[in-house]
Amino acid sequence: MAIQPLRLDPITVLGKQLVIELFDCVDQRFDDIQWIEESMLEAARQANATIITSAFHKFSPIGISGVVVIAESHLAIHTWPEYGYAAVDVFTCGDVLDGAQAVRVLSERLGSRRHLISSMDRGLGGHRLGLLSRSLAGNGPVDEDSPTLRWALGQGTGVA
């Protein structure tokens, strides 16, 4: 019997990834590894994630990279304090995690004045991308009521 290729129509979503760009981060602890790790753990807790472990590394002279491994997948961060910039990924394989809450916690704790959030459905057959929320003109909070953000988090249709 010949093996038949798996047919996908068009994508079998296995997880959702939020890609968060945090700009103009002004908190003075932005290069403090313990504070960044605690911020990431707090974001995971407030997002209802089940924390498994975490690992963080401080670069010389500045910058931090780290990951919080959760039962639902992971949260990762890479900081560039010299630019006031952080790149954050929140990936979840289930529908329990509140990604908007994780983003809100990190944006507030890092003192981000501008942000850009994109979403990607990931899985078998490819991926889908979407822009969720942006505050590139200055000091705007994460818009958790955005129809696009609700859609990306599996909470709505994405239509206003």
UniProtKB/Swiss-Prot annotation:
GO CC annotation: cytosol
EC category name: lyase
GO molecular function: adenosylmethionine decarboxylase activity
Post-translational modification remark: Is synthesized initially as an inactive proenzyme. Formation of the active enzyme involves a self-maturation process in which the active site pyruvoyl group is generated from an internal serine residue via an autocatalytic post-translational modification. Two non-identical subunits are generated from the proenzyme in this reaction, and the pyruvate is formed at the N-terminus of the alpha chain, which is derived from the carboxyl end of the proenzyme.
Pfam families: AdoMet_dc (PF02675)
The species this protein was found in: Pseudomonas aeruginosa (strain ATCC 15692 / DSM 22644 / CIP 104116 / JCM 14847 / LMG 12228 / 1C / PRS 101 / PAO1)
Key word Calcium present: no
EC number(s) per entry: 4.1.1.50
Active site: 73, 78, 93
UniProt key word Ligase: no
Name of the protein in question: S-adenosylmethionine decarboxylase proenzyme
Gene3D superfamilies (alphabetical): S-adenosylmethionine decarboxylase (3.60.90.10)
Associated pathway: Amine and polyamine biosynthesis; S-adenosylmethioninamine biosynthesis; S-adenosylmethioninamine from S-adenosyl-L-methionine: step 1/1
Alphabetical list of InterPro entries matching this protein: AdoMetDC_fam_prok, S-AdoMet_deCO2ase_core, S-AdoMet_deCOase_pro-enz
Cofactor note: Binds 1 pyruvoyl group covalently per subunit.
Residues found modified as Pyruvic acid (Ser): 73
Subunit note: Heterotetramer of two alpha and two beta chains arranged as a dimer of alpha/beta heterodimers.
Keyword list, A-Z: Autocatalytic cleavage, Decarboxylase, Lyase, Polyamine biosynthesis, Pyruvate, S-adenosyl-L-methionine, Schiff base, Spermidine biosynthesis, Zymogen
Catalysed reactions, as listed in the record: S-adenosyl-L-methionine + H(+) = S-adenosyl 3-(methylsulfanyl)propylamine + CO2
Site (Cleavage (non-hydrolytic)): 72-73
Family: Belongs to the prokaryotic AdoMetDC family. Type 1 subfamily.
TM annotation in the entry: none
Co-factor(s): pyruvate
